[in-house]
């Protein structure tokens, strides 16, 4: 478990681990994607009453212990820049390496704008290809055109 996350996040992640739960288990209980559930536990998403109730039931906790989950999160990066964790660094490297080409192709397809990171979903799947496990990471974000004024 990471040492640079908040008190509640540490508690929730440790509790999940001690109960032998996976992110898929949490996902089924909350009715949200595994990535969203991990974001919630890590303090990057804001829970509604229904989600707090589901987390409390899943982790055998009192809802009042989870009241902080209903607060708007302070979405400060929890990794140094550049990241030092190998997995997170590789994602950073992908953006640095492919970013300019992706931007150019996206602008040809959609026009001048950006992909929303707010109106966006992230999906992660495991596939088998040529006898090897592969990871498919999908960002599905609304295209926001720059406005002229």
Curated annotation (Swiss-Prot):
It is an enzyme of class 4 (lyase). InterPro entries: Cro/C1-type_HTH, Cyanase, Cyanate_lyase_C, Cyanate_lyase_C_sf, Lambda_DNA-bd_dom_sf. One of its GO terms (biological process) is cyanate metabolic process. GO terms for molecular function: cyanate hydratase activity; DNA binding. Pfam families: Cyanate_lyase (PF02560), HTH_3 (PF01381). SMART domains: Cyanate_lyase (SM01116), HTH_XRE (SM00530). The active site is at 90, 93, 116. HAMAP family: Cyanate_hydrat. Belongs to the cyanase family. This is Cyanate hydratase. It comes from Aquifex aeolicus (strain VF5). The lineage of its organism: Bacteria, Pseudomonadati, Aquificota, Aquificia, Aquificales.
């Amino acid at each position: 478990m990471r040492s640079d996350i908040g008190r509640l996040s540490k508690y929730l992640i440790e509790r999940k681990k001690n109960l032998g739960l996976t992110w898929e288990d949490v996902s089924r209980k909350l009715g949200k994607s595994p990535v969203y559930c991990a974001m919630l536990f890590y303090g990057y998403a804001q829970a509604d009453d229904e989600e707090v109730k589901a987390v409390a039931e899943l982790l055998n906790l009192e809802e009042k212990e989870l009241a902080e989950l209903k607060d708007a999160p302070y979405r400060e990066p929890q990794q140094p820049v550049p990241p030092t964790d190998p997995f997170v660094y590789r994602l950073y490297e992908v953006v640095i390496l492919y970013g300019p080409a992706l931007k150019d192709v996206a602008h040809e397809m959609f026009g001048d704008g950006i992909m929303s990171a707010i109106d966006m979903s992230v999906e992660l799947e495991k596939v088998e290809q040529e006898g090897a496990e592969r990871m498919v990471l999908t960002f599905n974000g609304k295209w926001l055109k720059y406005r002229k004024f």
